[in-house]
Structure formats: structure tokens, C-alpha cells
């Protein structure tokens, strides 16, 4: 059914148990980083999850399709984007498992109960507010640059909202990894697992996945890297296994 679509929107098949997703190409569409994050995050049966800066809600929808988590909450500051996310949730009849909340990450701990969530996920803006060229479209600038929230905001609120030994999952850019790990330790979210994502086996990583645990002891594992493409352009799965040819 497409009666939930607005002008300029499309309905995409997620290839995941019949789930479909509403997007607007002129605004912002989710990328492969969201898929990698949803694969990396470990959600156990019965757990509660908060996705900070959920955008159009892709992470909660993917996690609802991939895991047996009890409930997923997406927090999004842009009202129009949050409304689109709610329509995707309703389209897939996931209202009993996913809630989309319009609100500011910087005030997340005031909106939710302290130490309430088992898991927090985030695909935050990668660029500092003054780094590089901002996209003239505000919605894309907010998604890509730290215009409305910073790494400190995300980690501070996550520290307050995670249960003891609760898990934190984030995808980011490798050039900020030193800052990320330092700040995670400062906010008592100890880095536990790191995985780099390379476009090709002989190229530097372009993304990094990080798992942290609230109140844990220092000990980190480096996972085997994800290689996205073979040299001939063949699309690969995790750790270099062959997948279908890129089209």
C-alpha cells in the first residue's frame, strides 16, 4: 500500500521479512552505514533499545526485523523526519514494538527514565560543525555535521540512560577514533569491540563500528575488518565472503 506516501517519497523494499521503508530522495536516504550498524549491534530477546538521532527510523525498523528485542525507541529532533519515520513504522504494523519520539538528544535524559535502556545505538553526524562544506539543505546538514548535537552530547546522555553494563553501539569515521575512545572512557562507557570497514582490502577504512559498555572494565577486542568490494568491483559480505555482483 502506498497511501502513506507524500509527494516526492518512495517505498523501498528492505529485503528483510517483507519490511518496506518510506524515503524521500530530495531530503535524506539511509546508507550502508545504517545496515552495518544494525548488523553490528547485539540486541537480546526482551531488551529495550534507544536509537539516538534516528532520522527516518531505519535503525529501529532494521533491528525490529533482525532481533527479538522487546521495544525500540527512535529519538529525532526534526519533526518532519520523525513523522516520516512514524509512517514507516505504521506501514509495517510495528507500532507495538517501535516508538518514534520527537525531541533533542541534548535533553534525552530529561525525557526518559534514568538507566532505563539495555542498548543505545547511534549513527551520528560525522563532521564537526566547522569541518568541510555543509550541505545547503538543513536536513542533510543536521545529519552530516554536528550542528544540533555533538559527540559529547550523545555520550553524556547515553551514560545517563544506559543501565549498568548496558551496551552502546555507534558507527563513525576513523579519523575521529582517538577522540571517540577517549570520550567514551570519560563518560564511563568503556570501549569493548571495534570493527573497521574498508571499501577495498588495500584501501584505508572509511567507517568504524564501536561497541561500548556502561561501567565495564577496560578490555577491547578488534574484530576482523569488513571489506565492501573485491578489486573487480564484486560486492562482498562481511570479512570478504562473496556476495552477489554489484549492479
Segments (PLM) and residue ranges:
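Class I SAM-dependent transferase core
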Residues: 2-45
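A generic structural micro-feature
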Residues: 66-67, 113, 202-206, 220
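Conserved Class I SAM-dependent methyltransferase catalytic core
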Residues: 148-199, 203-205
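A generic structural signal for alpha->beta connector loops
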Residues: 18, 46, 69, 95-97, ...
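SAM/dcSAM-binding transferase cores
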Residues: 204-247
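Conserved SAM/SAH cofactor-binding pocket of Class I
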Residues: 40-133, 156
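General small-molecule cofactor/ligand-binding pocket signal
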Residues: 22, 99-101, 192-195
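Mobile active-site "lid"/loop adjacent to the S-adenosyl-L-methionine
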Residues: 124-153
Amino acid at each position: 500500500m502506498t497511501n502513506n506516501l507524500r509527494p516526492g517519497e518512495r517505498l523501498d523494499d528492505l529485503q528483510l521479512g517483507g519490511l518496506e521503508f518510506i524515503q524521500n530522495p530530495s531530503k535524506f536516504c539511509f546508507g550502508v552505514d545504517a545496515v552495518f550498524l544494525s548488523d553490528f549491534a547485539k540486541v537480546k530477546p526482551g531488551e529495550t533499545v534507544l536509537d539516538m538521532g534516528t532520522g527516518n527510523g531505519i535503525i529501529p525498523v532494521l533491528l525490529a526485523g533482525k532481533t527479538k528485542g522487546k521495544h525500540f525507541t527512535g529519538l529525532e529532533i526534526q519533526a518532519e523526519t520523525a513523522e516520516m519515520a512514524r509512517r514507516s513504522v505504521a506501514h509495517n504494523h510495528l507500532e507495538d514494538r517501535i516508538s518514534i519520539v520527537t525531541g533533542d538528544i541534548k535533553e534525552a535524559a530529561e525525557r526518559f527514565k534514568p538507566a532505563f535502556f539495555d542498548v543505545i545505538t547511534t549513527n551520528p553526524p560525522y563532521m564537526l560543525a566547522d569541518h568541510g562544506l555543509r550541505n545547503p539543505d538543513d536536513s542533510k546538514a543536521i545529519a552530516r555535521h554536528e550542528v544540533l548535537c555533538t559527540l559529547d552530547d550523545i555520550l553524556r546522555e547515553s551514560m545517563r540512560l544506559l543501565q549498568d553494563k548496558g551496551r552502546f553501539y555507534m558507527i563513525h569515521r576513523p579519523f575521529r577514533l582517538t577522540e571517540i575512545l577517549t570520550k567514551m572512557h570519560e563518560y564511563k562507557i568503556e570501549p569493548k569491540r571495534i570493527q573497521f570497514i574498508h571499501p577495498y582490502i588495500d584501501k584505508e577504512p572509511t567507517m568504524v563500528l564501536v561497541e561500548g559498555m556502561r561501567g565495564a572494565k577496560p578490555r577491547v577486542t578488534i574484530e576482523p575488518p569488513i571489506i565492501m568490494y573485491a578489486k573487480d568491483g564484486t560486492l562482498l559480505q562481511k570479512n570478504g565472503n562473496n556476495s552477489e555482483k554489484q549492479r
